[in-house]
Structure formats: structure tokens, C-alpha cells
């Protein structure tokens, strides 16, 4: 029985990570659309801002997944 639960757990984790990846892309596209309408795309400031926003988004998602994994192991 433990083998089946671990397989289902890993499949659900992969599905959750796929959803999180799509959320990252959706938020990134929305923020970049806002930045492109406000800032010219060929400036150095736009490139730096785009990189910083992407880094912050990935950092926040990484922290969220870390705390979710930490809380999941504490419950067991």
C-alpha cells in the first residue's frame, strides 16, 4: 500500500509543480505587458527591470514551495 501512495504523491507533486510553473508564466506575462506599455522595450532599464521582476517571482514561488514542503513533512 505504501508504494501506491508514494506513486500518487509524486504524481500529484509533479502536477502541482506544473500548475505553479504556469502561474509563474501567467503572472510574468501580465507584469511584462504592463512594463511594455509604460517603459520602452529597447532601454537598459527595461531589461534590468524585466530580469529583476522575473527573479522576484521565481524567488517568491520557491519560498512558497519550500514552506509547503516543510509543512507537509512536519504533519507526517
Swiss-Prot record:
Per the record, membrane topology reads: Single-pass membrane protein
Q: Which segments cross the bilayer?
A: 46-66
Question: Per the record, GO CC terms?
Answer: host cell cytoplasm; membrane; viral envelope; virion membrane
Chief site of localization: virion
Which pairs of Cys residues are joined through disulfide bonds in the record?
none
What is its subcellular localisation?
A: Virion membrane; Host cytoplasm
Q: Which residues lie on this side of the membrane: Virion surface?
A: 67-76
**Keyword set for this entry?**
Glycoprotein, Host cytoplasm, Late protein, Membrane, Signal, Transmembrane, Transmembrane helix, Viral envelope protein, Virion
Asked if Glycoprotein is a keyword of the record, the answer is yes
InterPro entries from the UniProt entry: Poxvirus_A9
Q: Does the keyword tRNA processing feature in the UniProt annotation?
A: no
- Which Pfam family name is an example for this entry? Pox_A9
Q: Where is the signal peptide?
A: 1-21
Q: Which family does it belong to?
A: Belongs to the chordopoxvirinae A9 family.
The record's function comment reads:
Envelope protein. Required for an early step in virion morphogenesis.
UniProt name for this protein:
Protein A9 homolog
According to its UniProt entry, this protein's organism is: Fowlpox virus (strain NVSL) (FPV)
Amino acid at each position: 500500500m505504501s508504494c501506491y501512495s508514494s506513486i500518487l504523491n509524486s504524481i500529484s507533486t509533479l502536477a502541482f509543480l506544473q500548475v505553479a510553473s504556469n502561474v509563474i508564466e501567467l503572472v510574468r506575462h501580465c507584469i511584462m505587458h504592463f512594463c511594455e506599455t509604460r517603459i520602452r522595450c529597447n532601454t537598459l532599464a527595461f531589461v534590468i527591470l524585466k530580469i529583476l521582476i522575473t527573479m522576484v517571482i521565481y524567488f517568491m514561488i520557491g519560498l512558497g514551495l519550500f514552506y509547503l514542503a516543510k509543512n507537509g513533512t512536519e504533519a507526517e
